Amino acid sequence: MNKGKIENIKDKIDGNELDLSLSNLTEVPVKELAAFPKATFLDLSCNNLITLTPEFCSLTHLIKIDLNKNQLVCLPEEIGQLVNLQHLDLYNNKLKMLPIGFSQLKSLKWLDLKDNPLEPTLAKAAGDCLDEKQCRQCASRVLQHMKVLQEEAEKELERRLLKEREQEKKKEAKQREKEAREKEAQKKKKAEEKERKRKEYQAQVAAVAAQEQQKKKKEEKKKKAAQNQGKKAAPESVPKAKRSICSLFFSLLLKLVLLLVIGVSSVVAVCQLTELRKEAFCIPLNVHFEETVRWAQGLDVVQQVIQKMSDLRT
């Protein structure tokens, strides 16, 4: 507020009216006005106001406000806080739209929006304000229009919030899918790593087994070679040992047979040629000897031998 032009607000009060019109104001002295709550009619017409601050809406004691012939291009969203406002003159400003909060002015009974570049739907709802009746109708229609806009805004806000929630859900779902894919990839990687280690372990075990098998084969070859060498040496010694044993056995046997033959021949000779042939022990022997001789003479082979011997003598 230009304090040089308005020295004392109190001097501008007449009853319940505070007249600050034609004061060349570019902003409203909200703090000073709040000190006079009994001044329920505020005249700010014919000034250079472009906007109203949100703090202006704290002057809830105001019932009537005249803002005609200013340069207002917008009203604060908080204007709905002026719950006691019944009369609002906005004639000849530069307003195109009204804030959604305007629908909260439930006490508003009179409104003038003439000579403002209003957007078509708002201008149609406002209509003319050439007399008291039309201005009252303007207030009613504009409030109704703003309530519809508020409902649409709330629905749009709800749709936007719903869309944002859906987008957030999709984002969360994508994040979960991404995490699941990463988890699955990590799990697969671990499984592949485990399989690789298992194959390496099996390869190591197989290599060790192959080495053991080769070592075993080499040992078996060495053992077989040693056995073959032993077998080659053994046949040479074993037959010699066998031959020596057999020779010794046959030699002893032959000697025994010769001794037996000599013994038997001696006994037979004694019993046949000496006077002992009449002895008791020689009689059976002589009988057996004679039987043996007769049996031998009966053999063809013996006869052939005797014949050959006779032929040789002649």
From Swiss-Prot:
InterPro entries: Leu-rich_rpt, Leu-rich_rpt_typical-subtyp, LRR_dom_sf, LRR_domain-containing. The keyword Transmembrane applies. Residues 146-216 form a coiled coil. It is a single-pass type II membrane protein. LRR repeats lie at residues 14-35, 38-60, 61-82, 84-106, 107-126. It holds the Pfam family LRR_8. GO terms for biological process: intracellular signal transduction. The keyword Electron transport does not apply. Required for nuclear import of FGF1. This is Leucine-rich repeat-containing protein 59. The gene is lrrc59.
